[in-house]
Amino acid sequence: MLYKTGVEYGDYTMNHVLGCSHGCNYPCYAFAMKKRFGQIKSYEDWCKPALVENTLELLDVEIPKLKDSIISVQLCFTTDPFMYGENYTEVGQMSIASIKKLNEAEIKCTVLTKGILPIELAELSDKNEYGITVVSLSSEFKKKMEPGAAPVGDRIASLKALHDMGCKTWVSIEPYPTPNIQFQDLREILDKVSFTDHIVFGRMNYNKLVSEYVDFREFYNEKAKEIKAYCRERNISCYIKNRTITT
């Protein structure tokens, strides 16, 4: 269940669900890899997530073995810990139970979701970090690219509620689209999440429309510069993903 991730800003991760109901069409790298290696047959199968029922039992075995080498555990990299909708309550409950178990072993957890962050998370370790993905405020973009995810306004509201209760929060603005995919003002997104402690920014990959945009490299360079300046002025920490900035 627990494994060391190769993601640049990650340590350990866990993915206690196969598939994701959000069905992102950026495209989704996790879906592409699972399909390539035969773990998922189709997009429809991917959008019908299967919970690993013995997640907590696996953690009981793995935590004692790995505890001393773990800095933090991220939920999740190939699925979502808080999928949107009443049909996925069990997934969210398992996510909270897993975080509790990791916290009991004094392991910090980092969460990222396109769903709604439950307010119960505020009762867990104050070392945890809770995040949401926001790459556009457009409901039409969400409908096309993140069809099963929570409305962006609801995501932000759930993050703000945790922030107001003293939790550490962060926002992933990745994969950020070029204007030929979604014309928008990055500043509007930043202003909506200006309360957060940390922002991660990254370009959109694996979508041919990105490279069709004239000067897409310069576009991402400028947006990264804008993020850095915005965060510096407001004392927000930020991280620009590798290969977002080009020279």
What are the roles of these predicted feature ranges?
Residues M1-S21, N25-S72:
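N-terminal [4Fe-4S]-dependent radical SAM core
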Residues L2-Y3, V7-H22, K143-M145, P151-V152, ...:
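Non-transmembrane, interaction-prone segments in cytosolic or luminal domains
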Residues C47-A50, Y88, R234:
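Generic alpha-helical secondary structure signal
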Residues T55-E226, Y230:
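Conserved AdoMet/S-adenosylmethionine-binding subsite of the radical SAM
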Residues T113-G115, P175, E233-T247:
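Acidic carboxylate-rich catalytic motifs and surrounding loops in phosphoryl-/glycosyl-chemistry enzymes
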